[in-house]
Amino acid sequence: MCRLLVDDGYIVTGTTRKPERVEALASLGVRPVVVDVFDSDLLRSAVVAAKPDVVVHQLTDLPPGLDPKLMPEARARNARLREIGTRNLVSAATAAHAKHFVAQSIAFAYAPGAMPYDEAAPLNVATADEAAALTARAVASLEQQVLDGPFIATVLRYGRLYGPGTGFETPQGGGPVHVDAAADAARRAIRLERPGVFNVAEEDGTVCGASARAALDWNPAFRIG
């Protein structure tokens, strides 16, 4: 996504928790900032200093390839990131008077029901599966916090990511999306300033991505290069 935005002429400030990732961000033409999203004061200062028109929330904390042995702890970390991290980032964006907020969500937290799932389908917050409920409740919290913010709010429910850097070279499970196409959806959301919630996934009968295709002129076949 950073590469697409820089190529489009945007001035991009990218955050990372780890100083060793600064060089990689800079190589993409991004202005790197080292900050922990859980440090609300430092985060607010960093975002205000960047003077953003748009804040893009792509924060996750998951192991490479979604290693099953590491996923129980990762789910808890990711849920905390979606809840508290989102709260801090929304607060920082508000303090910076950002015009638009784009947030990454997921298109695989729906409650079992008729498929393909569209954006009106309920999330799986009431399931007896503790792991699934933890994820769904955190997703619901993230989305509601963003939608309640004082800015144009766009929530992109990504399908199951595959492609370079994801740990999966081919689609895994229902409702996949290539990482390049996901990045392009974010770019289009930024450019078009479309508010709302959009499924961003390939059509395989699991998830309906018609809203993103119509509102964002998005094509799941998009690839960089």
Residue ranges and their predicted role:
Residues 13, 33, 154:
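Conserved beta-strand positions in the Rossmann-like core of class I SAM-dependent methyltransferases
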Residues 22, 197, 202-225:
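Conserved C-terminal active-site "lid" loop/helix of NAD(P)H-dependent oxidoreductases
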Residues 100, 104-108, 128-130, 139-164:
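Conserved beta-loop-beta element that borders a ligand/cofactor-binding pocket
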Residues 17-26, 30-84:
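NAD(P)H-binding glycine-rich loop region in Rossmannoid oxidoreductase-like domains
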Residues 66-130:
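Conserved Rossmann-fold NAD(P)-dependent oxidoreductase catalytic core, especially the SDR/UDP-sugar
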Residues 161-165, 172-198, 202-203:
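Alpha-helical substrate-binding/gating segment
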Residues 1-11:
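N-terminal Rossmann NAD(P)H-binding glycine-rich loop of SDR-like oxidoreductase domains
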Residues 38, 81-84, 133, 137, ...:
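Residue-level signal for the nucleotide or nucleotide-sugar donor/cofactor binding architecture
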